[in-house]
Amino acid sequence: MNETGVKSDLPQPIFVPPHSGKALEFIGVTHILTTNQTGGAYYLFESVFGPGDGNQLHLHRREDEVGYVLEGALEIRLADQTVVVEAGSVAHLPKNIPHAIRNPLQTPSRYLFMTIPAGLDQWFDALDAARNAGTLDDALYRKLSLDYGIEWLE
């Protein structure tokens, strides 16, 4: 209901205070705005990579990614090039483009990522639940990845 008592189907504003998102420590991700909160429009999360941390070559079948470097730098490896983006820079990675990302520095780096459409948070949550249950191994990791449209190429 809005202030006049009339039911409204319009999206409502969301305000997220600092440090209030759900943190998934083992993968260095903090949910800021989830699939449920945005009605599936997008997912926003913060990620912290330690020195040299990152992931292997992969692609997303479902979502585009936009990354903003808050602190440090982000090294993005594509099929034929590697690009380093520094604090204040933005990177747009369309779906179906193979890429790997890592922190090239000797200090932690912080990033803000948005995926469009939403849904990647559900993959992170599934990984977190399996880890907490003690069932997360490489086979389950790869299965859950495929379930959420992520293909590991290395």
Residue positions per predicted region:
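A short, N-terminal "cap"/entry segment at the start of jelly-roll beta-barrel domains
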Residues: 1-41, 129-154
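Short acidic-glycine-tyrosine-enriched beta hairpin
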Residues: 15-17, 80-98
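Conserved short histidine dyad/triad with adjacent acidic residue
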Residues: 17, 28-32, 45-60
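Ligand-binding loop in jelly-roll beta-barrel domains
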Residues: 38, 75, 95-121
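Short beta-strand segments
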Residues: 55-57, 78-83
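A hydrophobic, small-residue-rich beta->alpha segment in the mid-to-C-terminal subdomain
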Residues: 110, 124-130
